[in-house]
Each structure stands twice: as C-alpha cells, then as structure tokens.
Amino acid sequence: MSNNSKRKGNEGERLARKLLQDCGYLVVKSGGSLSEVDIVAIGNNDVRGIQVKVSSDSRMFQPAKLEAVRETLYDLPRPPSFSYEIWIRYKKKGDRKWYWHQEV
C-alpha cells in the first residue's frame, strides 16, 4: 500500500470517527492496518464494527468489490446488538460523499 493510499485511508477513518463521536459514540481505532474492522463504535444500545474504504475510483462500488469485503465481515462473530458495516467515502474532485453499506 502506498503512502498516499495510507494517508487517504487514515483521513477517511478520522472523518468516520469524528462523525460517530458527534453522534455520541465512543470510538476505538483498530490496532492493525490489516484487521477486519478499522474502527469500533460503542453506543448506548449498539456496537458497530466498521470497515472504512476511501476511493476516487467508482469501480470500488461494483458489487464484486464490495462482496469480497462483505464475505470477510460476514463470517466474524456477531454478538447481540453488534453490526458490521462498510463505509465508503467517494473522494473525487468536487464530490466528497459518504456512501453507507450497512448491516453486512
């Protein structure tokens, strides 16, 4: 992974953490860059394991690409009130939107 990719990924994770903290979640960043989830958000009634992706390439949204990530998350243990989610930040000049793919 290039330094630029790491930088964009870290920026995406930072923005996701801020958004969740603003919604009242306690947010913990996963220790390793190769773990299944990037951040864990703990709320009053739920816990969310989130894989954050940042892309300027619309191909990231193709079903086959997302399915590979979904399959990894789908097989993980799932305690009550725990959800796995994929958050994608589409970062293209003039278009910086979050696209949510929840409940894997």
Question: Each predicted region: which residue ranges?
Answer:
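Acidic-basic catalytic patches of nuclease active cores, encompassing PD-(D/E)XK
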Residues: 1-30
